[in-house]
Every structure is written in structure tokens, then in C-alpha cells.
Design a protein with these regions (language model features):
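Active-site beta->alpha loop and helix N-cap motifs at the rims of alpha/beta catalytic domains
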Residues: 2-147, 154, 265, 280
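C-terminal alpha-helical cap/extension of soluble enzyme domains
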Residues: 2-3, 9-20, 43, 105, ...
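Short glycine-rich loop/turn motifs that provide flexible caps or phosphate-binding loops at active sites
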Residues: 11, 51-54, 84-86, 163, ...
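Short, flexible micro-motifs
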Residues: 15, 55-58, 88-90, 167, ...
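Conserved active-site and cofactor/substrate-binding residues in soluble primary-metabolism enzymes
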Residues: 28, 35, 63, 67, ...
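A structural signal for short hydrophobic/aromatic patches embedded in well-ordered alpha helices
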Residues: 68, 126, 156, 235-238, ...
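Glycine-rich phosphate-binding "P-loop"
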Residues: 111-114, 161-162, 276
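Catalytic alpha/beta core domains of metabolic enzymes, predominantly
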Residues: 134, 144-246, 250-253
Length: 297
């Protein structure tokens, strides 16, 4: 997919998918992935993002990463665009890029490195190496930390395959300042979902990623349709409706993020299941709170 076409897809809403496991957490539940993706494609979700933070990227082996991606591609059956998360070491990420290219997906998202010792200079070299290795793959960078600065982004804009940024760090004023400096040579996507999408769109975002889209794509579409037509009154109605759910996801210092989405999926007849450690299991009280909230949607 050429960059212009993919930018059009990125300028919409997308789902960051969960990874369902077997009951003992030892295996990827392939059948569950197929069921979940069938639900998403039947609801016309345009862009599916496996192997991200919501997909417990850092809890997957390299083989499992491939299984998740391949299963989702086959399940989507060209009914949605797939963009996978890549990362870890440079060597691992390059292998993931090669696998992605071999599976004919159009784009990848480079996750923000989780490294104990990291510097701006080192991070810049990390991105440059992967952008060069990506070749004809469209690349989205995930801003999830302070070292991916405006200056660094500007230096990386020289790469034609750098097409977008999932922005999920800092204040809205920082995001606004970034767009003022760098313009719209890439697509800016709100990486903090429906809750903050109205504010990011006012500042210049064109799309947003969503976790709740895993089980409530109609809510994501309602938000996007409102934002696309600048109906901010409607957008804020959706924002107010989903805020209690997002508050639950922020519990335990944000550690509730994925298990809350998975529990909601289970309640809706989809396959979420449990998370692998170091993510925790929810209490019965947490699960009831989720049901109480989403039953009003």
C-alpha cells in the first residue's frame, strides 16, 4: 500500500487488539483471535493493530508474535488493514520487519523501547536503523516517552516511509506545539483513545487508536463520525459516556488498562481472558463495575 493510501487509513479510528491466551496462559488461543477478528471485521473496523501494548507485546515470545500476526491476517481476510507492533532489540525488530514484509502487510508501528539505559542519541539511531530496514513498509512511531522529541521527529521526517505518529505522552499543549512546529507531513493519531480524542482533534490529530473498540466498535465509530464532521457536542457526549470505563483502566497506576478491556470482551461474548504476569487479574468487584458501566452504552 503506497504511503498516501495508508495515511488515509491511518486518518481514522483503529483498534489495538488484545491477545487471548489459553486458560493456563501457556499458549496463544488462535480460535479466540479468529472469533474476535471476525467480530471486528463484521463491524467494519478499518485498521487493526496487533502486537501492541494492549496486545501484551512484552509478554510474547518471538514465535508467538508471529502466530498472533499471521492469525489476524488470515482472520481479517483483506476486510481490514493490519499494522503490527514491532520492537525489542534492533535484531529482533528487523526480523519482525522482514516477517511483516513477507506476510504482505502494509505497515508497522515501532513501539517505544523499554530499556533501562536509553539516550536521545541512542534512540535516534534505533529509529534510523529500523526506518532504513523497513524499506517499503509504512512506519508509524509510537510516542510513549519523553525522549522522542520534536527535534528527533523532525530529523526522522527525511524518511519517506515515516508516515505517522501515535501520540500518547505529555500534555495536549505539548502535542499542539509539536504540530505547530512540524506540520502535517505525517498523520498524527491520538494514542490515548476516545477519552482525549476530541481535544487532540482540535489540536490537529486526524485519527485515534482505541482499546474499547475491541468490544464496542460502534462507540469508536460514533466518536470518529462526530469528530470528522466537527460535531464536538456529540463527541463530548461520547467522551462523557466512556470516561468511567477509562477511569477503571487507569486503576492501579494504569496497570488495569488491558485486563479491564479483556473483562469487558468476556462479558460481551468475545474472548478476552486473563493477562500474563506481570499484569494482574481483576477482582470480582472490578468485573462487576465494568458490567455496570458498559451495560449503559
Amino acid at each position: 500500500m503506497d504511503p498516501t493510501k495508508f495515511k488515509e487509513v491511518l486518518s481514522g479510528f483503529s483498534v489495538t487488539t488484545v491477545t487471548p491466551f489459553s486458560d493456563d496462559l501457556s499458549q496463544i488461543d488462535v480460535d479466540a483471535i479468529e472469533l474476535n477478528i471476525d467480530f471486528l471485521t463484521k463491524n467494519n473496523v478499518p485498521l487493526i493493530i496487533p502486537n501492541g501494548n494492549t496486545g501484551e507485546f512484552y509478554s510474547l515470545s518471538e514465535k508467538e508474535w508471529t502466530v498472533v500476526l499471521q492469525t489476524m491476517i488470515e482472520a481479517a481476510s483483506n476486510k481490514a488493514t493490519i499494522m503490527t507492533g514491532v520492537g525489542h532489540s534492533i535484531k529482533t525488530a528487523i526480523t519482525q520487519l522482514e516477517i511483516s514484509r513477507g506476510l504482505n502487510i502494509p505497515a508497522v508501528m515501532i513501539l517505544y523501547p523499554q530499556h533501562v539505559f536509553i539516550s536521545k542519541e541512542g534512540l535516534l539511531e534505533y529509529y534510523r536503523t529500523l526506518l532504513e530496514a523497513a524499506k517499503d513498509l509504512n512506519v508509524v512511531l509510537y510516542k510513549k516517552g519523553p525522549l522522542l522529541t520534536d527535534m528527533m521527529l523532525e530529523k526522522l521526517l527525511t524518511y519517506d516511509n515515516f508516515v505517522g505518529v501515535k501520540y500518547a505522552f505529555g500534555r495536549i499543549v505539548d502535542f499542539s506545539r509539536t504540530i505547530s512546529k512540524l506540520g502535517h507531513r505525517v498523520v498524527w493519531s491520538c494514542g490515548t483513545a476516545e477519552r482525549f480524542a476530541p481535544f487532540f482533534f482540535l489540536a490537529g490529530a486526524k485519527g485515534f487508536t482505541s482499546g474499547l473498540c475491541n468490544f464496542a466498535p460502534h462507540v469508536s465509530r460514533r466518536m470518529f463520525d462526530a469528530l470528522k464532521t466537527s460535531n464536538f457536542e456529540e463527541a463530548m457526549k461520547v467522551q462523557e459516556m466512556i470516561t468511567p470505563f477509562e477511569d477503571l483502566r487507569e486503576g492501579r497506576g494504569g496497570a488495569n488498562n488491558v485486563p479491564v478491556v479483556k473483562a469487558a470482551m468476556d462479558h460481551m461474548g468475545l474472548k478476552g481472558g486473563s493477562c500474563r504476569p506481570p499484569i494482574h487479574q481483576l477482582t470480582d468487584e472490578d468485573r462487576q463495575a465494568i458490567i455496570d458501566i458498559i451495560s449503559k452504552w
